[in-house]
């Protein structure tokens, strides 16, 4: 499932784990802090994975696009 992930870049936060994950799944950078990701993870597993990659209090959102072009939007509480 394609997902658009976006977050606020905060000075002092380390995003290396996120960038490594994006590279591993061959994510596509759209803007400084927005990426297109294609993953087979369920919504729940995707959110869990993303939570593990960010620092507390980061603002993270994603949009999922199904193969039928249905959209799903959610804020991930970190």
Specify the residue positions occupied by each region the protein language model found.
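Charged interaction segments
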Residues: 47-78
């Amino acid at each position: 499932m394609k997902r658009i992930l976006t977050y606020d870049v905060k000075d002092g936060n380390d995003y290396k784990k996120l960038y490594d994950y994006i590279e591993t799944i061959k994510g596509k950078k759209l803007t400084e802090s927005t990426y297109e990701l294609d993953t087979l993870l369920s919504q729940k597993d995707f959110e869990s994975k993303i939570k593990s990659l960010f620092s507390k209090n980061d603002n993270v959102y994603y949009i999922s696009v199904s193969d039928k072009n249905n959209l799903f939007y959610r804020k991930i509480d970190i």
